[in-house]
Amino acid sequence: IDSINNIDTLIDEKGAKSEQDIVGRVYEYFLGKFAATEGKGGGEFYTPKCVVNLLAEMIEPYHGKIYDPCCGSGGMFVQSVQFVESHKGNKKDISIYGQEQTTTTYKLAKMNLAIRGIAANFGDVPADTFFKDQHPDLKADFIMANPPFNLKAWRGPDELTNDPRWAGYEVPPTGNANYAWILHMVSKLSESGVAGFVLANGAMSTNTKGEGEIRKKLIENDLVDCMIALPGQLFYTTQIPVCLWFLTKNKKAETIPGHSDSNHRNRQG
């Protein structure tokens, strides 16, 4: 009860909060508390709100299809909807697609959005994104994600070596899934799609087992918009510094969903 009293459910300057918003704040509060208590295990499904806010502000998902291939408890989607509504938009203008492998976390995500009245497609079952893609034909306008940092043994030595998601690039190494996540997200972007995601800082400079070649090719293909280094100690899972990556599928397009030309130029400058 004392914990609930600490949650911001007061009326703000814009008027009374809806019951859905209040319940959503309570749910979000306890997700954060649980993640802090569980440490590494809890952090697998929870991304700090300040990081999610920054991603949303950078990619500006006003309308279109939003995708998270490792959606955890669904925080990226909640913040996307809040971003749209705070800019006088309509949450019905966005369509949400997510995937989560862990059964419990999959249920947490569905509940997180359901209590807020947010429609979402999480696929039929919890599943591994690399081996059982729940949205095989999806082309997303926006991707927001916080993949597991430096995931090891994500595939066997002879598995997924000819996967079409790696076409034109080196095959991501078995010992670290960071670049597999990147290439998966690139494959999911629409022709003018934008992606913003979190990775360990090492992803910006690694040259291990073809990762440097993949990064070089991403730059040569003019996909990398910018990278932002963040301070350490932001996550419950790790104390190492992290970075944000932003990819744009077609920088030469006259318009990108949710972006004005001036905003897009400013981001690249």
Language-model features, listed with the residues they occupy:
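Glycine-rich S-adenosyl-L-methionine
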Residues: 164-189
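Flexible, glycine-/basic-rich loop-and-beta segments that form/coincide
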Residues: 235-269
